[in-house]
From Swiss-Prot:
This is Motile sperm domain-containing protein 2. Residues 265-279, 300-312 have a biased composition (Basic and acidic residues). The gene is Mospd2. It comes from Mus musculus. It holds the Pfam family CRAL_TRIO. Residues 365-366 are annotated as: Required for FFAT motif binding and phosphorylated FFAT motif binding. The record marks V374 as: Required for FFAT motif binding. It is a single-pass type IV membrane protein.
Length: 518
């Protein structure tokens, strides 16, 4: 069955490419960017995303590709950069990428209160949207995104329906299959009619992706660690520019050697989990690769040290999946699997293999630098060699599915040194377009507890969740009750006013007829 589906998908992709080339490119090639046409012939995922959004109907997919490619050329999407956007707009902080929702999707923030409807700036705002989406699409090919419309403190002068429609079209036509959901926070009641129009733009299939929330419901979609305080969250993030804020990856703990107290804590944890093995092999920050100038004595000590590392990492399960990049093969390909706390297997392994003819420098960064220790996190790898990187949660901190790791790699000149000072200088000077990047998600393996213990934990968790749900429902009920009371009071007031006006009118009519007949 799966094989048939794969064959059908391949046929649809091939037919789409062939027909687009024959029916559109020959006549309208000047309307498209040649880079987009070339990418269409090479990137199966890109073609499949358009087919998916048009339910695998090739005729509809071709129309969508035509519209999308014309838009990409009109906006010069492939050439958009920071210099294409007015600096004041980047400094404003109305549109940016930051954080993740509970499903691990990146958050695309639209702070509506910072937008003023103005025909002079609408094109720049649209280009900023396109800039962020294209930047994200190139880094996270095919991974969904959650749009956060923050409408708190929003007035009518901030509502631009043309701009909203453009954002909707970006996900309907220009970046299909990228939309996870649209979360609308604290929408003013006066905008209800306007968003009925938005629903019609989305279409019946995508309407379910629209989530209207207040402070009470927002945590159903985003955890407090990625919500700002005005949404009831604890995220200390404050927007500023420069630099661009979408790079949430930071240096993990102890890149340049652990702090004494932290090292002692880690040593105790490892002694308990691994018997008498020491941390020397995994806390060594020296680059594993040997330079050409190293002497035989150093070579012997390095060899012994590497053998120790090998014996240490034998306790880890080698990842099976492999991402094949131009500089490094990285294993695992997409997800880091950490053992459960109960199993004691908290650490995991990343294997890097240099597939070039030169030394490759690498760095490992993470979205949660306070939670993880990475050894080594900044080093180099000889041609054809492999390096094992050990990643472990720090202390008692737990692994989250929202955590991410970024591996950065760049090819070094043969004459370059690989010491800490040389590596630091190298990363300052290497051009951005020479750096290979690959991202990894985190995943916790289910606990291997006995069923009886699992049942107790499950009952306890269900009890806590039920209590929390009841509390939320009670709050909502009280809020609804308060609104009903307000409406009732207003209704009584209107009835009293109407009664008073009726009495005045009746008195006037009686007086009129009395004066008429007397």
């Amino acid at each position: 069955m799966a094989e048939n589906n794969a064959q059908n998908k391949a046929k649809l992709i091939s037919e789409t490419r062939r027909r687009f080339e024959a029916e559109y490119v020959t006549e309208k090639s000047e309307k498209y960017d040649s880079r987009d046409v070339e990418r269409l012939q090479q990137d199966d995922n890109w073609v499949e995303s358009y087919l998916y959004w048009r339910h695998n109907v090739v005729d509809e997919t071709l129309k969508m590709l035509d519209e999308s490619f014309q838009w990409r050329k009109e906006f010069s999407v492939n050439d958009l950069s920071e210099s294409s956007i007015p600096r004041w707009l980047l400094e404003l902080g109305g549109i940016y990428l930051h954080g993740y929702d509970k499903e691990g999707n990146k958050l695309f923030w639209i702070r509506v209160k910072y937008h003023i409807k103005d025909q002079k700036t609408i094109m720049d705002k649209k280009k900023l949207i396109a800039f962020w989406l294209e930047r994200y699409a190139k880094r996270e090919n095919g991974k969904p995104i959650t749009v956060m419309f923050d409408m708190s403190e929003t007035g009518l002068n901030s509502i631009d329906m043309d701009f909203v429609r453009f954002i909707i079209n970006c996900f309907k036509v220009y970046y299909p299959k990228y939309l996870s959901k649209i979360v609308i926070f604290d929408m003013p009641w006066i905008m209800n009619a306007a968003f009925k129009i938005v629903k019609s733009w989305l279409g019946p299939e995508a309407v379910s992706l629209l989530k209207f929330t207040s402070k009470n419901e927002i945590q159903e979609y985003v955890s407090v660690e990625y919500l700002p305080p005005h949404m009831g969250g604890t995220d200390p993030f404050k927007y500023s520019y420069p630099p661009l804020v979408d790079d949430d990856f930071q240096t993990p703990l102890c890149e340049n050697g652990p702090i004494a107290s932290e090292d002692e804590t880690s040593s105790k944890e490892d002694i308990e989990g691994d018997g008498k093995e020491t941390l020397e092999t995994i806390s060594n920050e020296e680059p594993p690769a040997l330079s050409e100038k190293s002497n035989p004595t150093e070579s012997v000590s390095k060899k012994d040290e590497n053998e120790k590392v090998d014996s240490k990492t034998k306790t880890f399960k080698k990842p099976l999946s492999v991402f094949k990049g131009p500089l490094l093969h990285i294993s695992p390909a997409e997800e880091l699997y950490f053992g459960s706390i109960e199993s004691g297997e908290k650490k995991t392994l990343i294997v890097l293999t240099n597939v070039t003819k030169n030394i490759v420098a690498f760095k490992v960064r993470t979205t949660a630098p306070e939670k993880y220790r990475v050894k080594p996190s900044n080093s180099s790898c000889d041609p054809g060699a492999s390096i094992d990187i050990i990643v472990s949660p720090h202390g008692g901190l737990t692994v989250s599915a929202q955590d991410r790791f970024l591996i950065m790699a760049a090819e070094m000149e043969q004459s370059s040194g690989t010491g800490p000072a040389e590596l630091s200088q190298f990363w300052k000077e290497v051009p951005r377009n020479k750096v290979m990047e690959h991202r990894l998600r985190c995943h916790t393996v289910e606990s291997s507890k006995p069923n009886s213990l699992m049942l107790k934990d499950s009952i306890s968790t269900m009890s806590d969740k039920t209590s929390e749900d009841l509390y939320l429902q009670l709050n909502r009920l009280l809020e609804s009750n308060r609104k009903l009371e307000d409406q009732l009071q207003r209704s009584i007031w209107f009835q009293q006013l109407l009664l008073a006006l009726t009495m005045v009118l009746l008195d006037f009519v009686v007086s009129f007829f009395y004066s008429l007949y007397n």
